[in-house]
Design a protein with these regions (language model features):
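Second-shell loop/turn segments in exported
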Residues: 1, 31-36, 77-80, 88, ...
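Structured lumen-facing ectodomains of secretory-pathway proteins
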Residues: 1-51, 58-60, 67, 73-123, ...
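Metal-dependent peptidase/peptidase-like ectodomains
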Residues: 1-14, 164-278
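Soluble non-cytosolic domains of exported or imported proteins
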Residues: 4, 37-38, 122, 131-139, ...
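Solvent-exposed loop/turn segments at secondary-structure junctions
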Residues: 36-40, 53-54, 67-71, 166-170, ...
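Short, solvent-exposed loop/turn and secondary-structure capping segments
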Residues: 57-60, 72-79, 153, 171-175, ...
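Short helix-loop-beta-strand segments that form the rim/entrance of peptidase-like active sites
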Residues: 122-129, 143-172, 194
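His/Asp/Glu-rich mid-to-C-terminal helical/loop segments that flank catalytic regions of hydrolases
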Residues: 280, 284-339
Length: 339
């Protein structure tokens, strides 16, 4: 409130009033707090570790994630009530159809909620934090970037690290970057995206697929669509891990109804004919919910994914030749995506 408005309201200069002063004025009025979206510039964040081979350092391997999420809810909800409901009715969070719970399901929901109430009181929340989607992938590329930067021996090719914005609004950041890349787009030899790599254990209520719900489960989208050699290099890097992941290609199948191939940032590069893959530990009950919080992340599993991606990236960056493309380069990068 301005000094002039305060003087009008109080009937005296507010600086002349002592604490506890009673004023005789009565003021009435109406006010409102309008809520409207504000345009704000979002940014991709790009870093480069330069390659060591003069003949190859102008080629780039891209590693990516996205740092945006889906905002907040206008009305807060109880954290534990939502988790209990989703655990029973919507095990894939926002990708599960919304429907009423049956009588039997309400019994299970109340039992889960009763057990949670013994631990803590109700907690209202409206912020969709996105700890897994995609805080997990963002953390991973930062750790991988630090490992490459600190290594005394740099990879032969250069490595791009791109944290995209606008993924949740339709791959806007990655599409913009691929269309206006900071390096020649044809110099990017491959793209590895990490999106939701911090969950996927049995307690997250898996919904099927090879090895789903185990510590070794990992969804792989797009790895062999453009270059089988690229996919095989990633499989070889995985096989060298102390505990290899079980790669699940279920959601990469042509025509799969969930359309994962078209929904992750790797596709923005694939439409230019760049061998591209998206790694994920899978969806869960907190997907696009206010309950996607850091407390539910499995940090050891996240670190294992990041290590495997690092090793695969290093192998590709050091290979004598870039991954060989098996299909023609698309003539129109703006053509509709086909799962």
């Amino acid at each position: 409130m301005s000094r002039l408005a305060a003087a009008s309201l109080l009937g005296a200069d507010p600086t002349s009033l002592a604490p506890g002063t009673t004023v005789a004025n009565t003021v009435s009025g109406q006010f409102d707090f309008p809520r409207a979206p504000v345009r704000w510039q979002a940014r991709n964040v790009v870093g480069i570790v330069r390659g060591s081979d003069p003949a190859l350092r102008t080629q780039y391997l891209s590693l990516s994630a996205h740092h945006d999420h889906v905002g907040f809810d206008h009305s807060p909800v109880d954290h534990d009530s939502l988790r209990a409901f989703n655990r029973v009715v919507r095990p894939m969070g926002a990708d599960s159809p919304m429907r009423p719970a049956t009588d039997d399901e309400w019994v299970r929901i109340r039992a889960i909620l009763d057990s949670l109430r013994q631990v803590h009181r109700p907690r209202l929340d409206s912020i969709r934090n996105g700890a897994d989607d995609d805080g997990s992938g963002t953390v991973a590329i930062l750790e991988i970037a630090e490992a490459f930067a600190r290594s005394a021996t740099k990879p032969r090719r250069s490595v791009l690290f791109v944290s995209h914005t606008g993924e949740e609004a339709g791959l806007l950041g990655s599409r913009w970057y691929a269309d206006h890349a900071t390096v020649p787009i044809d110099s990017i030899v491959a793209e590895i995206d990490q999106d939701m790599i911090g969950r996927g254990t049995a307690s997250d209520f898996p919904r099927g697929g090879t090895g789903a719900g185990s510590p070794t489960y990992l969804e792989v989208i797009g790895a062999k669509r453009i270059s089988r050699e690229f996919g095989e290099m990633l499989e070889a890097a995985n096989a060298r891990q102390p505990v290899p992941f079980v790669f699940d290609y279920t959601y990469d199948q042509p025509g799969h109804p969930l359309q994962y191939y078209c929904r992750a940032d790797h596709y923005s590069y694939a439409r230019y004919g760049i061998p591209s893959v998206a790694f994920s530990r899978g969806e869960h009950l907190d997907y696009h919910q206010v309950t996607d919080e850091a407390q539910y992340i499995s940090y050891p599993d996240l670190a294992r994914v990041a290590q495997m991606v690092h090793d695969g990236a290093l192998a590709i960056a050091n290979a004598p030749e870039r991954p060989r493309r098996d299909v023609p380069k698309p003539t129109d990068p703006n053509a509709p995506c086909r799962q």
